């Protein structure tokens, strides 16, 4: 029995020794161990560091100053007195009078001084001091270096073409100039043949439509389909006349292009209106654009 009790005491002593060693190596355990002793160990006090965040407090001594704050970085307060930071001075627009030195005022720009060489431009410089009155310095004279080999190329005036004769087309007087009509005879002949072929083909198609559709006694002129065909024929005649004028007289090219665009837009609008009015009509009126095929055989 005594042997058992002695063995139990040895076990307890060993456990106490191991716990003490672990506690000595662990700083947290040492802090907890000395909590009851009111932290009498100076080394433990030096190890425990409490970081304080900056506290922004309203300054009491600068209560009447707007936008003033007191930045206190210590946990126990500022013992040396309040040192307020004026926000108004931190965010001031511009500079203070004692920070401005040798402010230069450039002269107004002038074309004569820019193009002419050896022109002296005056730059007035003023300095301000901390006193209430500022004394301006006399203007300094700066001489620009002479520019060598400076040439100014003049812009030639725009010359209007000389008009030889006036061409009256659709009650519009258009001047034909000799400088713009530079088409060779061979190209002009080819364009003339193209115009004649297009005219002849166009006339054949128009005659066929007039015979089969418009000249029919039983036709209803109030029918949207018939009205569309009549408008197409009228617009196509205008386009052929404009095309021939564009070939014969080159100054009419811009006018001809504008006229063709207007005519084509009229054709497309008429075709859309006809399709909207004839929903049950199976004929596709878009085939009538520039191709006068008879669809009412």
From Swiss-Prot:
Coiled-coil stretches: none
Region (Disordered): 12-43, 65-85, 122-151, 265-297
Bias kind Low complexity: ranges: 122-135, 268-287
Disulfide bridge map: none
Ranges of biased composition (kind: Polar residues): 65-79, 140-151
Protein name (record): Putative uncharacterized protein DDB_G0291005
Organism: Dictyostelium discoideum
């Amino acid at each position: 029995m005594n042997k058992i009790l002695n063995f139990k005491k040895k076990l307890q002593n060993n456990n106490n020794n191991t716990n003490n060693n672990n506690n000595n190596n662990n700083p947290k355990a040492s802090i907890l161990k000395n909590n009851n002793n009111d932290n009498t160990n100076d080394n433990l006090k030096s190890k425990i560091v409490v970081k304080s965040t900056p506290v922004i407090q309203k300054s009491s001594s600068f209560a009447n100053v707007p936008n003033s704050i007191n930045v206190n970085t210590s946990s126990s307060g500022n013992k040396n007195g309040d040192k307020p930071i004026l926000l108004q001075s931190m965010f001031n627009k511009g500079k203070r009078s004692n920070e401005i030195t040798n402010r230069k005022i450039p002269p107004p720009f002038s074309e004569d001084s820019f193009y002419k060489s050896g022109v002296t431009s005056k730059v007035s410089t003023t300095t301000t001091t901390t006193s209430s009155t500022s004394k301006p310095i006399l203007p300094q004279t700066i001489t620009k270096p002479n520019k060598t080999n400076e040439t100014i190329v003049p812009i030639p005036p725009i010359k209007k073409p000389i008009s030889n004769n006036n061409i009256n087309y659709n009650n519009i007087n258009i001047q034909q100039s000799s400088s713009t009509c530079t088409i060779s005879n061979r190209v002009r002949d080819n364009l003339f043949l193209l115009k004649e072929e297009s005219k002849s083909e166009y006339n054949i198609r128009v005659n066929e439509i007039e015979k089969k559709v418009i000249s029919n006694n039983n036709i209803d002129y109030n029918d949207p389909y018939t009205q569309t065909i009549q408008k197409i024929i009228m617009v196509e005649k205008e386009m052929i006349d404009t095309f021939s004028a564009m070939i014969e007289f080159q100054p009419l090219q811009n006018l001809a292009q504008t006229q063709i665009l207007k005519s084509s837009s009229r054709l497309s609008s008429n075709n859309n209106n006809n399709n909207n009015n004839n929903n049950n009509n199976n004929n596709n009126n878009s085939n009538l654009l520039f191709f006068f095929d008879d669809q009412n055989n």
